[in-house]
Amino acid sequence: MARSKTAQPKHSLRKIAVVVATAVSGMSVYAQAAVEPKEDTITVTAAPAPQESAWGPAATIAARQSATGTKTDTPIQKVPQSISVVTAEEMALHQPKSVKEALSYTPGVSVGTRGASNTYDHLIIRGFAAEGQSQNNYLNGLKLQGNFYNDAVIDPYMLERAEIMRGPVSVLYGKSSPGGLLNMVSKRPTTEPMKEVQFKAGTDSLFQTGFDFSDSLDDDGVYSYRLTGLARSANAQQKGSEEQRYAIAPAFTWRPDDKTNFTFLPFLLPERAGNRLLRLVAERGNR
């Protein structure tokens, strides 16, 4: 009996301690809930896609607009023909010395039919030659006149994009090869200031320098200009042969209103290159 009398106060003390601890914890939870601030509402708005023109720079390496298939500024996904576009941004990554080098990774296009020479942009599209009498090379939608080894050549540094349209195109472009055509788009003046100077050196004693400047001539952007130039010298694959290319392309744009613009796109590209079609090598020694 004595043990039970002495144990009873201990149980009472434990019960009191549990009740007090529960009350204190409840007060702390209530206090935390009371001081917790309200969550702010965050609204996320997607940025609009950058505007792109079929005759201007692409927002990314993959172009979304083209004028080759319809001769109008049309989304590529809405053009029924098969079109591949190599943009200036992609060319800057690969650093091609010719347009055919820029098209090396384009499906359905063979570029190595004339060896290592960069003098001509000879292409084979879907098994059909794009040079010769058909001359399927175009600049800004206009055919570059030429015949076999008398073809007009454009340096890729002068271009905003190079586009390949595969398949028959005589409905839009007249007489042409059934394999397809190459359409090159020149760099055009911009209303935002742009300045670029490059120096490049490489194998075969390659040395190249170029510049690309563009800006608006007035505050309203009515008149703008662009001046692109290039000078390159390198040894050819054959010993004793040398390639020299100089190019300059001044451009001027007049925008009388928001829906009208006139752009002048002259260019000059003199080139000096050794003959790679036939080379006789003198042999020394007794016969």
Summary of predicted features, one role per range:
Residues 1-38:
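Cleavable N-terminal targeting peptides that direct proteins into the secretory/outer-membrane pathway or into
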Residues 3, 39-193:
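Acidic, small-polar-rich N-terminal luminal/periplasmic segments of exported/outer-membrane proteins
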Residues 18, 22-24, 129, 203, ...:
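Short, flexible loop/turn elements at secondary-structure junctions
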Residues 25, 38, 105, 219-221, ...:
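Short, structurally constrained coil/turn elements
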Residues 80-81, 141-142, 202-208, 268-270, ...:
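N-terminal short leaders/motifs
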Residues 123-127, 238-239, 275-276:
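Short secondary-structure transition/capping segments
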Residues 146, 157-160, 171-248, 254-260:
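Outer-membrane beta-barrel translocator/receptor signature
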Residues 232-236, 246-255, 259-287:
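Acidic/polar loop-and-plug regions of large Gram-negative outer-membrane beta-barrel proteins
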